[in-house]
Structures are given as C-alpha cells and as structure tokens.
A protein has these predicted regions:
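Structural signature of transmembrane alpha-helix termini at the membrane-water interface
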Residues: 15-25, 49, 77-85, 267-274
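Generic hydrophobic, helix-prone segments enriched in Leu/Val/Ile
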Residues: 17-18, 65, 229, 255
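Hydrophobic alpha-helical transmembrane segments of multipass integral membrane proteins
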Residues: 7-17, 42, 67-80, 263
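Structural motif marking the loop-to-transmembrane transition
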Residues: 1-4, 57, 61, 252, ...
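Membrane-embedded alpha-helical segments of integral membrane proteins
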Residues: 1-50
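A structural signal for short, hydrophobic/glycine-enriched beta-strand patches
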Residues: 78-261, 265, 271
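Transmembrane alpha-helices and immediately adjacent membrane-cytoplasm interface residues
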Residues: 44-89
Length: 275
C-alpha cells in the first residue's frame, strides 16, 4: 500500500508537470495535482510510521482517515458517472435555439477550449440553418472584451450568417449563462410575435403568433463535453423543459483536470441550490 501511495504521488506530480509544459501555469485547478501529491506522500509516510510504531498508535485515527477518504472517493466516482452520462446525450436536429456557452478568451481571440465549442457550433449551424445561436458570455476580470463578442467575430469569419446569431454579454457563470440567454430568447420570440401580428393585420386575417412562453420551444446547450451535465441540470432547475445537449471535445491532456474540477463545481452548485 505504501508503494501505491508513493506511486500515486509521483503520477500526480508528473501530470502537473505535463500540464505546465503543455499549457503553462494558467490552467485553473491545476494546483490540485501537487496538493494531491503532497496528500499521497503524507499518507505514505503516515502508513510507514504506523507500521513501525503500531503498538504506540491507536487504531481510530487510521480508521477515521480511511473512512473519510473512502467516502470522498465514492462521492467523486458517482459525480464522474453523472458527467459521463451528459456526454452520452444524443444531439437533436433543427432546434429553435442553441445556447453556446462562452469560455476564457485571450485578448480578442478564443482560447482552445472556446474554439472547440465554436467549431462545433459552426458545424451545427451549417446543418441547421433555421436554428438561432445564442452566444452567451460576459467580460471576465482579465478579459478585454465580452466572450460573446469574440464568439460572434469568430463565427462570422467562418461563414455563419449574422441573422443566425444572438448575443448575451452579461453572464459571468453557467447559471447566468442560462438565465440571461433565456431572456434573449424570450425577447426574440416577442419580436417574432410582433412581426406575425403586423403581417396578419396587413393581410386582414386573424393574428397568430408563437407567444413568449418557452415551454414549446426546443433549446440546445452547446458546451464542452465535461460541462454538459451541469449546464443541462442548471437549465432544468431554471424551468427550461425542452433542453438538449450538444457536446464539444476537450483537450485530451486536460481531461483528468477538467473532470475533477467539474466534480467540485457540480457539488458546489448542488449545495447552492442551482441544480
């Protein structure tokens, strides 16, 4: 067991080194890995000390530590399974709206994570020309402009029609992404209603319009694969009934870091009542 703990500590340090060499020190949550390495090293040293001083140390500290770590591992395992179920969601064609969730931007350029989402959005827009894309993302503290504006320019440059794009530039987290995007969708539906009313009024027929309720509207959420479960759960918590997922791939090297970070984000949102 001591050897296993020492090996786990070494793997955590190697993985952290790989992240730093590949992407630098800017990856969020990456310090979790040296912390885990220190924890595994501490446990290995503690077990070694216990084996050499077994008669002097009571059993309850060891039992307590194993119980706590086992419970934490079980919770994380369950959440990881839930994240996996989000990735397996099938994509629906011809949705009315697709909310494209923003991610970090570098100056006026999308980050690698955001670029993968946008490339997926381009593919969906080409195959579903009647679907509106709601580009959702405000301006972060270390960002020059709103994420939605960077997304808009990238999609326009890659041939997505301006008429297919709607912007939401106020949100700073996933909960706000969904909330403010619903407001954009509702405003668009109300505008369509006014247009319908004007058209039918001019031709002298009874007015019919879609109304501003979102119950009958099919809404997709496009985000990174690991993020899809939480995004859909937040949307359902906010009352979005017909919500579907569209996943974009993640950087293979960062998958362990992204998935574990998402575990803690899901637990936090559950505790805060967001899902």
């Amino acid at each position: 067991m001591t050897v296993i703990l020492e090996a786990a500590a070494g793997l955590c340090l190697l993985y952290y080194g790989g992240i730093v060499l590949s992407t630098g020190f800017s990856v969020s949550f990456s310090l979790f890995w040296p912390f885990c390495a220190a924890l595994f090293g501490f446990l290995a040293a503690g077990r070694h000390y216990y084996l050499n001083h077994r008669e002097e140390i009571p059993v309850w500290p060891l039992v307590s530590a194993v119980t706590v770590l086992g419970a934490a591992a079980a919770v994380i395992a369950v959440v990881l399974v839930l994240i996996g179920t989000g990735i397996l969601t099938s994509t629906k064609k011809s949705m009315d709206y697709v909310i494209v969730l923003g991610a970090k931007v570098n100056g006026t350029e999308p980050s690698n994570s955001l670029k993968k989402r946008l490339d997926r959005a381009i593919d969906y827009a080409e195959n579903n020309p009647n679907t509106f894309l709601v580009l959702s993302g405000g301006q972060g503290k270390d960002e020059e402009i709103a994420e939605a504006e960077v997304m808009y320019e990238y999609l326009r440059y890659n041939g997505v029609p301006e008429t297919q794009l709607l912007l939401e530039t106020r949100s700073t987290n996933t909960r706000e992404n969904i909330r403010y995007s619903q407001e954009v969708i509702r405003s668009q539906e109300q505008w369509k209603e006014r247009v319908f009313q004007q058209i039918f009024k001019e031709v002298g027929e009874n007015a019919y319009a879609p109304g501003d309720e979102l119950d009958s509207i099919h809404i997709g959420i496009l985000t990174s694969d690991f993020h899809l479960f939480r995004a859909k759960a937040i949307a359902k918590k906010q009352g979005v009934r017909n919500v579907y997922g569209i996943s974009a791939p993640s950087d293979p090297l960062l998958i362990p870091n992204l998935w574990l970070r998402e575990c803690f984000a899901i637990l936090k949102d559950k505790f805060m009542g967001n899902i």
